[in-house]
């Protein structure tokens, strides 16, 4: 049986990107979905999302007749849209005759319409006019994390920036699992779906495969991106919160190594698990472009956490809330160290100033001593 596993072809120009999907035969769930969302029922469901509806002509004008292309994905092309009021958005258009795209379009409208978090890419509207299926998102001006890790002509991310991105993504997924009601499992966490805004804050994107966690929700065939998919999910076809945790663990190793999960990342990580002295040699797999500018204690903490996340058995993986808390503690320790360094610098400065004051005082005393008349 052919599994609809997404491949992670990196689109260096993507700002909002799906990646290529290999389609197997339609599943029972797909048929149920298609039959349920029809005609007036579909329009009713979309209207209940509460999202603004954009007229097709307005989007056509804002994208210069859909010529300002940013990238291409399984869903269809993505365009940059500049609205008359000055706002800039990313517009994702459903490719014609795309059954998978129709499903993902409805899924994103229904799921993202009720989700709001600073570490998610917000859906700001849609168009479902005369057969057109278009999603309108916030524009992420710095593109995807994958572009920074693998794209040409990009400055390598600093270690501090990589830790911050890990913290941002963890907060976004934690919100999906524990803050949303009902909870949401993303099911396609990967570097191409982590977008960076103008301040380089990371946001989780692409909810076309995501699902709300409900007891009556049917299971589906395995979907996701090769290299990121939970092996337990592949064997059971049952997705859980821990499937997202596994994918996030792969993402952490990506941030550390800048190695593609589809090109031997985990084999490379395996070489570092035991070095000649019988200790974990995480320093050996760090991205060479960092030139050793890495906080070693943070590296070890990050790699150890990633290793727990990618445990083959889901019961041995931490929940996303625990993962997020551990990553936030790294930031607290870093800030504490920075404050301590600043305090020591201030103390050293004060001591230097105090010594200077003493010397000034001694000079003043000497200057105040009257000269003795010559005999």
Predicted regions and their residues:
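Intrinsically disordered, low-complexity cytosolic regulatory tails
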Residues: 2-49, 293-375
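Glycine-rich ATP phosphate-binding loop
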Residues: 79-96, 122
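Regulatory alphaC helix of protein kinase catalytic domains
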Residues: 105-109
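Short beta-strand micro-motifs within the conserved protein kinase catalytic domain, predominantly
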Residues: 124-131, 141
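A conserved loop-to-beta-strand element in the N-lobe of protein kinase catalytic cores
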Residues: 130-138, 146-147
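Conserved catalytic-loop aspartate of Hanks-type protein kinases
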Residues: 244
């Amino acid at each position: 049986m052919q599994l609809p596993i997404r491949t992670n072809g990196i689109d260096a120009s993507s700002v909002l990107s799906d990646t290529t999907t290999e389609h197997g035969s339609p599943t029972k769930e797909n048929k149920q979905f298609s039959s349920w969302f029809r005609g007036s029922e579909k329009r009713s469901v979309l209207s209940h999302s509460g999202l603004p509806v954009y007229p097709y002509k307005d989007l056509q004008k804002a994208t210069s007749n859909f010529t300002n292309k940013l990238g291409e994905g399984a869903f269809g092309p993505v365009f940059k849209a500049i609205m008359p009021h000055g706002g800039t958005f990313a517009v994702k258009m459903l490719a014609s005759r795309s059954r998978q795209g129709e499903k993902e379009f409805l899924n994103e409208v229904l799921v993202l319409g009720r989700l709001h978090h600073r570490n998610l890419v917000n859906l700001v509207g849609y168009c479902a006019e005369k057969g057109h299926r278009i999603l309108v998102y916030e524009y992420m001006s710095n593109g995807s994390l994958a572009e920074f890790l693998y794209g040409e002509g990009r400055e390598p991310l600093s270690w501090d920036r990589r830790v911050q991105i890990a913290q941002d993504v963890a907060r976004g997924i934690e919100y999906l699992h524990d803050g949303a009601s009902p909870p949401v499992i993303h099911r396609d966490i990967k570097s191409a779906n982590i977008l960076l805004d103008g301040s380089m804050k990371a946001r989780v994107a692409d909810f076309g495969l995501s699902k709300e966690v409900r007891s009556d929700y049917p299971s589906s065939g395995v979907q996701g991106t090769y290299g990121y998919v939970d092996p337990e999910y592949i064997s059971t076809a049952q997705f859980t919160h821990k499937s997202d945790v596994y994918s996030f663990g792969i993402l952490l190793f990506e941030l550390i190594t800048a190695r593609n999960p589809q090109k031997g990342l985990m084999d490379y990580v395996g070489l570092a698990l035991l070095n000649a002295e019988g200790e974990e040699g995480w320093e050996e797999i760090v991205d060479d472009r960092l030139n050793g500018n890495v906080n070693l204690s943070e590296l070890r903490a990050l790699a150890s956490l990633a290793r727990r996340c990618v445990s083959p058995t889901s019961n041995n993986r931490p929940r996303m809330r625990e993962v997020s808390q551990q990553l936030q503690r790294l930031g607290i320790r870093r800030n504490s160290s920075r404050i301590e360094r600043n305090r020591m610098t201030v103390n050293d400065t004060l001591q230097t100033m105090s010594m200077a004051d003493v010397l000034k005082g001694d000079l003043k005393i000497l200057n105040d001593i009257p000269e003795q008349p010559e005999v």
